[in-house]
Amino acid sequence: LRSSGRAEKTAGLDTLVTIFMDTDIAANIAAVKQRIAVAAARCGRDPHSVKLMAVTKTVIPPRIAEALAAGITLLGENYVQEAKGKIAVATAPAEWHLIGHLQTNKAKYAVHLFHCIHSVDRWELAAELDRRAKLANHHLNILIEVNVSGEKTKSGVPGADATALVQRI
């Protein structure tokens, strides 16, 4: 939902906000969809089989409304708390995905807010999401986040443990 990064590194916050707020979201979305169509054609894939997700991290609701009006139907949010407010004021139906790290104690909220959790990285979280989804009679899709780099600062199940986690789930 942001601009293509035209801001200079030395620009102040006010300048960055102005650049991002002046960006034509509909035009950006159209340009991205065109790039998807070209790439899909190059490899013989149906461009309609590609899903475009707009990430709402730090984006204010009026800008999200612009994206929804421009045809975006899939939104990704990093934070459960931020999603609560944004989903409540969304101007059109959309499929919301949690793309950020999820603490087990926030699973109870995530189950009701999101269609999919992209960051499951441990059995305890998967089990709690499953338990909460069953209580809510809600189907919840999950994706396993794998830390393939092995960096301690990155989230995700270590690559060597990923298969065991998937099998257990």
Show the residue positions of the predicted features.
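N-terminal amphipathic/basic-hydrophobic helices that include classical n-h-c signal peptides
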Residues: 1-20
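Conserved alpha/beta-domain cores
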Residues: 20-169
